[in-house]
Structures are given as structure tokens and as C-alpha cells.
Amino acid sequence: MRGMFLTLLLACTDPESPLPSPVLGEPVHVVPSGGLPAQVEVQPSANNLDVVRHDGSVFFAFRTAPDHFASADTHLYVLRSDDETHWTLELPIFQGTDLREPRFLSLGDQLFLYFAVLGDDPLAFEPQGTMVTVRDAEGRWSEPEWLFDDTFIPWRARVVNGEPQMIGYTGGEDIYNADGMPEIEVRWLRSDDGLSWDAVVPGQPVVETGGGSETDYVILDDGAVVAVTRNEAGDEMGWGSKICRAEAESPGDWRCVADPRKYDSPLMFRASGRVWLIGRRNLTDDGNYDLGMRDLSFEAQSIQYELAYWQEPKRCSLWEVDPEALSVSFVLDLPSRGDTCFPSALETGEDRFSVYNYTNDPEGPDLSWVEGQHGETWILRQDLWFE
């Protein structure tokens, strides 16, 4: 018995023993599906989404519009379910302009939904700011109100160690403006009530300035922060992404390294003792967004990289992030194709998740990203676990 115990102990502590590997369940259709309420009018494009568990139910928000691009016909729907199959309409949102980035925050008996308001020009990215609506304990939603006084776009909202936090960015109107070096600000915020927000790092709401926009992060056991920022606009570090880290004693001092790949719509989480990322993958030989054309001007590079990226197929993928080396390794693709990747996930158990994502038909033709943006997209969910 003693020998068996020692063998098991050595196996558990052997650094050479294999680590748990990710496993994907079968995808399930959420949008469109027969489980949606009749009041929900699904248009060809269903994409930006979020999901959260609140008051014993699952709440799901998604955007639907004629296509991927900005539209005055955009609707947001908030649905509720007890089984993630049959859904009840909680709240429709329509404002005659584009709406994106729905983000939930469950706080006590209140559920907050933040969302970005943009213009309706399909050829422009025109952030107007963030609005919020609140569901009270009786299930009543408030009228949406403006939350910030600038063009802030929320990217993730969650409770971290008991504290509501949000990360997002301002200056998004510069992402597709190739005229000069951008000064987009990534802001890391905290709140006591979900409505009034200030800096996580006292006196320092901005943790990164440059070309970075969409950003997600995790907190390690030692309190260090590891983050992935989409750097589509480019800056002195190049284009693609930034992989960043800040130590617990100085959480506002982000040290970043450049990655030439662009992990659009980053979702970060921890499982099996490691750091994971779900984000878009460019289906080329090296996957790079930054093509290294340094003989061109900054403005010309920005245009060339964007045009090249639009012409390639995409996947929504699981990646592993090394929190020490600040490097990212490809792991596997979710069922995805064409216009895809705006993930959200529910934790369903230890190292188990229900992942929601949008895509063109994953069994259909391998469309370029721009082709897919004009096509029909679905929202799927599937289980992800580690064994």
C-alpha cells in the first residue's frame, strides 16, 4: 500500500506527466433555432454576443442585423433560459443605429447590460459611447442610459475577487484611420455599484496607449495580470497583438511584447492551471497580420495589412498563453468558418465551460472574411473541458 501511494504521489508531481488536454463537445445551434421566442426576428447576421449566469438562469444577449457591418436596422436581444435550449425574451433593444459589444455584469440581485452605440454608416467605425440597462430583483429592466461621457467601448465586464471590473477602450474611431500614429487608450476600471466607475489602479485608469483596442486579461495566483490586446491600428511595436503582464505590486505597469498575429475578440480564462485565449485565427501559412512591409509608410502598411486580412479565411481558435514568456501557441479550432469569433463562456464546473460563438456555416465553403461578413452567420454553443 505504501509503495502504491508513493507511485501515485510521484505521478501527480512528475513534471513530465502529460497535462490535461482540451476537449470539445458537439456544437448546438442557438441562433437561429426552434428554441427562440417568436418575438425574436433573426436577420441574416447574428454575431456580437455575451452570456452570463444570474439568479439561477442563463442570460444571453446578441446582435442581429442585415450583415456584419453597421446598420440602422440593428437589434440587440436579451434572452433567458434554464436549459440553454428554450429561451424567453427578456429585453429587445432598438435605437435606429448600430449597437455592438453587449456585456453583462451580474452583481447581487441586479444584472447590468452594457453595450456600445455606433453610427449607421456601413463603411465607417463611429463609436458614440456606452449605454447601460439594469435588471432589478423583480425582473424589470431600466431604460438604457449613457454611462460614460466619451467614446468608451466596453470589452469585458466581470467580478474579480469580489470586485466588479471592466476593461475597454476609447479612441476607437482611430482604428481604421490610417492618418498618423493612433492614441487609443485601454482603460481598466472598477466599481462598487455597476454604475459609477473609477480606476482599478488608483489614479491610473489608462493601462496601455497606442494601437491596442480589444483587451482581455486574467489574474494569476500571485496577483500578476496577464493580458492580450488586439493591435489592429498599429503603433511603434508594429501591428497584430500585444501580450502584456503586470506584477501584483505594480498592476498599472504593463510590460508588453509584440505578436504579429491578431487575436480579434479576445476571451481569456484559466483552466487546468494554465492561461487560455479564444480569439480569431488568420488562415495563412504563418497567420500573421503584420506582414513586415517596413519599406512602406506607416499609413500604407495599415491599409495593406487590413486589405490582405480581409481576403483570407478565418477560424475561431483556442490558444494557450505562456504567462512568463508572453507567447501564444495555437491549440485547436472551434467549428468555425468565414466571418467568425466573438466568444463568451459560462463556467459549468471545474475546468468545464459552455462556449458561445458565431460563425458562417462551419461545414460550408471556406469563405474569406469579407465574403463571410456579407453572408449568414449563426450562433453556436459547445462544451469545452480538460482531461
Language-model segments: what does each one mean?
Residues 13-47, 52-100, 105-265, 269-338, ...:
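Beta-rich carbohydrate-recognition and catalytic domains
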Residues 340-342:
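Active-site pocket scaffolds in enzymes
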